[in-house]
């Protein structure tokens, strides 16, 4: 897992990370950028794929709605598409799905 140097310079990433910190604070275990932007092969109009790993995730769909509000605010401000999904913190270590494998392999901690 790499640490994103782009996190300090990309306003979409910094805005999203700040919003997650405000929403979730100590419940955040990690926030991970994955997909084309993490691999470095994104096009200018590529979306931002982000996994948000949360402690005490009781209602995934409630958190999806909260994160969607942040995604919309970022789109309104920057025109960038963010696709973020919440996951239970333990799924980082314990899930063997192809998507989780990709996130662990190519992901960039934000």
Predicted features by range, described:
Residues 49-53:
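Short beta-strand->loop micro-motif that forms the acidic, two-metal-ion catalytic signature
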Residues 1-30, 39-44, 55-110:
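Catalytic core of pol beta-like nucleotidyltransferases
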């Amino acid at each position: 897992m790499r640490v994103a140097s782009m996190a300090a310079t990309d306003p979409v990433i910094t805005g999203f990370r700040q919003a997650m910190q405000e929403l979730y604070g100590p419940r955040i275990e990690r926030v991970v950028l994955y997909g084309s932007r993490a691999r470095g092969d994104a096009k200018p109009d590529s979306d931002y794929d982000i996994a948000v790993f949360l402690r005490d995730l009781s209602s995934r769909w409630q958190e999806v709605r909260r994160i969607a509000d942040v995604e919309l605010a970022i789109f309104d401000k920057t025109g960038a598409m963010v696709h973020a999904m919440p996951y239970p913190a333990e799924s980082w270590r314990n899930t063997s799905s192809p998507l989780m494998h990709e996130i662990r392999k190519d992901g960039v901690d934000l």
